[in-house]
Amino acid sequence: MDNYLDLMRARREQILERFYAALDRAGRPHDAARLIAVSKTVGVDETVAAIQAGYRHFAENRPQELVRKLTGLAEHPELPEVRFDMIGNLQTNKINAVLGSAELIHSVGSLHLAQAISSRAVRKIEAGELVGPQRVLIEVNVSGEESKGGFSPDEIRAAAGELAELEGICVQGLMTMAPRGQVRMWHAGTFAGLRELRDELEAAHPDLNLPELSCGMSEDFESALEEGSTLVRLGRVVFSPEFAVK
């Protein structure tokens, strides 16, 4: 594990160099975005190494794995405090496992799911089990790929007002994924489309404040940062020794 920790530290320096260079190219300050280490493919030991290497913000795509990581890390009180987000598809029967455990849910892709999260959160707030509304991002299928979930741009335009009124959630922004296997130009267009949609929604709904844009992964995070992403979700480039850092 010592060799893995050394790799993690060296890899983090390389990632941050690229991260800050992308922000510089866009004329954005270095604190304009945050790096999320997606730990969904690794165990608790690897996550501990990532924390020791300097990462403080993590994400999981399955509720049971989120709970497992939090339970495992609780056995390491010597580590600094970290936060976990939920980024994967969330089924309604798993909502209670995520509420209060995930700082931010990135993947609210339907009005039905938003309503379900809100109603469960309200009950937990009333029972004293949750401090306040659950922070969420709305997943938007900007690219229009049939294989991807989320609101279409037209659907989120129609639902934005209702989402803003749900008492148990606080909508913080939007999330999307770029098309699979496409060239960088297409990825940049998807990320720019998310930013433009956010600006449009804020203009149409003054009660909506959407500071967060979650987009960009291991292969395309630099393009995302150049187009305004505030949260990049990096898995393989952080954790996989085999991933080629360009």
Where are these regions (language model features)?
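Gly/Pro- and small hydrophobic-enriched strand-loop and loop-to-helix capping segments
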Residues: 106, 229-246
